[in-house]
């Protein structure tokens, strides 16, 4: 029920019902439609064209950007490609839907903290300067998670260098 690939009209109806329920309780809330694969413009076009066709509403588009998962899923071949495609997708989505966007999930292998810091710095800078100010922010998904979840940003109950990218605002300082 409500699977976009099987019945877009029903999926859009469920999305609209959620939107209406939120607005009935808190009219000023921003309703975000969030998808994974932020570097995959076809996925976003499919969903948002379907939502638009069936008149579903949203206030913001949320993207997940994980180089690890994008490479695993063969959406990209490198971290650089993930970053380039994600920023291009953000700009395309803005041009198409004129809706603010946010990177609502990202993460990096905490066993590679310096590489993670560098990637997050680049992502922050790209979102800030290459996305024409349409990207309203970035959330690191479960940074405190460690052990079973490799894409957290903590080791031994302490933040790794990955989190320094947020403290430094993506300035690419070493």
Positions of the model-derived regions?
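Aromatic-rich peripheral "rim/lid" segments of glycoside hydrolase catalytic domains that contact
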Residues: 3, 7, 21, 78, ...
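Active-site mouth of glycoside hydrolases
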Residues: 1-6, 35-39
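Glycoside hydrolase catalytic-domain groove-lining segments
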Residues: 9, 13, 17-20, 24-31, ...
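Short, surface-exposed recognition loops or helix-turn segments adjacent to catalytic cores
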Residues: 27-36, 169
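Short, well-ordered beta-to-alpha junction loops that form the rim of enzyme active sites
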Residues: 35-37, 106, 143
């Amino acid at each position: 029920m409500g699977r976009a690939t099987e019945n877009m009209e029903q999926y859009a109806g469920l999305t609209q019902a959620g939107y209406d329920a939120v607005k009935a309780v808190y009219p000023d809330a921003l309703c975000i439609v969030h998808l994974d694969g932020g570097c995959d413009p076809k996925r976003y076009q499919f969903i948002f064209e379907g939502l638009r066709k069936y008149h579903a509403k949203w206030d913001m588009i949320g993207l997940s950007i994980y180089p690890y998962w994008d490479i695993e899923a063969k959406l990209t071949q490198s971290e650089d490609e993930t970053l380039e495609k994600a920023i291009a997708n953000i700009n395309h989505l803005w041009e198409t839907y004129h809706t603010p966007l946010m990177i609502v999930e990202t993460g990096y292998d905490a066993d590679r903290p310096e590489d993670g810091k560098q990637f997050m710095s680049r992502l922050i800078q790209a979102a800030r300067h290459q996305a024409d100010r349409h990207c309203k922010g970035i959330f690191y998904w479960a940074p405190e998670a460690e052990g079973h979840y490799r894409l957290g940003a903590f080791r031994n109950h302490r933040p790794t260098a990955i989190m320094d990218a947020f403290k430094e605002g993506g300035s690419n300082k070493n």
